[in-house]
């Protein structure tokens, strides 16, 4: 029996973690068991997901299955995008130059800053009264 070819990639953004599986197919994107256009409330987020495929010209070459946890929709879309880009690298190192040029291989390190004691938020201080 012939083995199924699969490529895996993991992406993170804010508090979201996405595990991506690429299999040769027709370009279907399934997120947590639901088509991507139904899972994400905004079509722009789905376009965001497709950026690595567009950059490498592989929109119709792979079926993508994603399991994503944590965070909100934007973080989940960002994590999925990075996961897809990393899975494409596993498929072929030739894609690296194109993905790097568009900035799709860089993990966005911006996360929420912690609240400090004595302050109302991460940086917001209580109102100061001179007298």
Swiss-Prot record:
SUPFAM superfamilies registered for this protein in UniProt: Ribosomal protein S5 domain 2-like (SSF54211)
Keywords: Ribonucleoprotein, Ribosomal protein
Record-stated family: Belongs to the universal ribosomal protein uS9 family.
Protein name: Small ribosomal subunit protein uS9
Signal peptide: none
One cellular-component annotation, GO: cytosolic small ribosomal subunit
Organism: Mesoplasma florum (strain ATCC 33453 / NBRC 100688 / NCTC 11704 / L1)
NCBIfam families, alphabetized: PRK00132.1 (NF001099)
Disulfide pattern: none
InterPro entries: Ribosomal_Su5_D2-typ_SF (IPR020568), Ribosomal_uS9 (IPR000754), Ribosomal_uS9_bac/plastid (IPR023035), Ribosomal_uS9_CS (IPR020574), Ribsml_uS5_D2-typ_fold_subgr (IPR014721)
Transmembrane residue ranges: none
Gene Ontology MF, one: structural constituent of ribosome
GO biological process, one term: translation
């Amino acid at each position: 029996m012939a083995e199924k070819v699969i490529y895996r990639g993991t992406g993170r953004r804010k508090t979201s973690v996405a595990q991506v599986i690429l299999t040769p197919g027709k370009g279907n994107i399934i997120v947590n068991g639901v088509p991507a256009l139904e899972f994400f409330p905004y079509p722009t987020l789905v376009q965001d997901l497709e950026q690595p495929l567009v950059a490498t010209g592989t929109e119709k070459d792979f079926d993508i299955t994603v399991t994503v946890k944590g965070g909100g929709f934007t973080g989940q879309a960002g994590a999925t995008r990075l996961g897809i880009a990393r899975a494409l690298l596993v498929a072929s190192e030739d894609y690296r130059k194109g993905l790097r040029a568009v900035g799709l291989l860089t993990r966005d390190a911006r996360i929420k800053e912690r609240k400090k004691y004595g302050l109302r938020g991460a940086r917001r201080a209580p109102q100061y009264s001179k007298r």
